[in-house]
């Protein structure tokens, strides 16, 4: 049975931890507001960019000579996967959920006997994936020193991907990230960015028609690289908001659990103290009676 001193030390230790988790929750809440706002503002832009490219692609006259970023290499033998995770922990199941999503895709690639290459963005994802997929990881990227998510970081990743694609290092590129829904819910996403998936358009469909100057091919050649960076930036913004939301939720839960533990330990301490006092009184009374 724990002594009174042991219980006092445990109560003090849990209270100290509770202060830390409460502070982390408040910091995450402050960061979440900004991250959520950035993610919500970025969604319309990335969606519009994607829609413009899809509209342009439907007007290409020579499909065989379409930009490779749109049409692909004609094969799907080598798959490059970009897995976005966090550089810091204490954010609940945020990292494990997206890793789980990515591993399902990796298993599918292995079953189809295709080649898998991985780029990890975030040290936590790298640490988990290297245990099983060490030989598949071709690049490790971290923005730990960046205070905020910015487009230049996404553009660096985008340029790296395009360079590898032009060197014929892969055929298909898919990005994995968490989409922010609310503080409690973050949804793991899987999005193919190379080649860009274009929906089948019916001949008699009455969609919006635009005239482009210069022609669609030239505009696409300029827009496609920007779109890749834009989609990566969107994923990074969503991931950042999801991370802060998950951390806030995890720290809130940890703070409440610490409070409950303090209450239980305090009750145990009071009972032990009461028992010790009662025992001491009995010994005093017994000693007095024996005199």
Predicted regions and their residues:
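C-terminal beta-strand-loop-alpha-helix "lid" module of Rossmann-like NAD(P)-dependent dehydrogenases
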Residues: 1-291
């Amino acid at each position: 049975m724990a002594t009174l001193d042991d219980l006092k030390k445990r109560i003090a230790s849990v209270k100290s931890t509770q202060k830390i988790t409460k502070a982390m929750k408040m910091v995450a809440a402050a960061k979440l507001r900004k991250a959520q706002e950035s993610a919500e503002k970025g969604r319309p832009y990335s969606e519009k960019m994607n829609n413009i490219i899809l509209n342009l692609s439907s007007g290409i006259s020579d499909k065989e000579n379409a930009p490779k970023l749109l049409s692909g290499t004609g094969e799907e033998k080598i798959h490059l996967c970009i897995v976005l995770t966090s550089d810091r922990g204490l954010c609940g199941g945020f990292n494990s959920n997206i890793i789980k999503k990515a591993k399902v895709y990796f298993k599918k690639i292995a079953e189809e006997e295709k080649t898998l290459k991985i780029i990890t963005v975030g040290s936590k994802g790298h640490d988990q994936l290297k245990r099983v997929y060490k030989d598949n990881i071709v690049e490790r990227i971290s923005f730990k020193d960046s205070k905020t998510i910015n487009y230049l970081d996404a553009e660096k990743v985008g340029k790296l991907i395009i360079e590898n694609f032009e060197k014929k290092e892969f055929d298909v590129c898919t990005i994995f990230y968490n989409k922010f829904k609310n503080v409690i819910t973050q949804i793991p996403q899987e999005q193919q960015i190379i080649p860009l998936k274009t929906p089948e358009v019916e001949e008699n469909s009455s969609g919006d028609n635009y005239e482009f100057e210069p022609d669609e091919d030239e505009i696409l050649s300029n827009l496609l690289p920007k779109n890749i960076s834009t989609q990566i930036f969107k994923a990074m913004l969503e991931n950042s908001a999801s991370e802060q939301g998950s951390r806030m939720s995890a720290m809130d839960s940890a703070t409440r659990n610490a409070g409950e533990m303090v209450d239980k330990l305090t009750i145990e301490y009071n009972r032990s103290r009461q028992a010790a006092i009662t025992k001491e009184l009995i010994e005093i009374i017994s000693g007095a009676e024996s005199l």
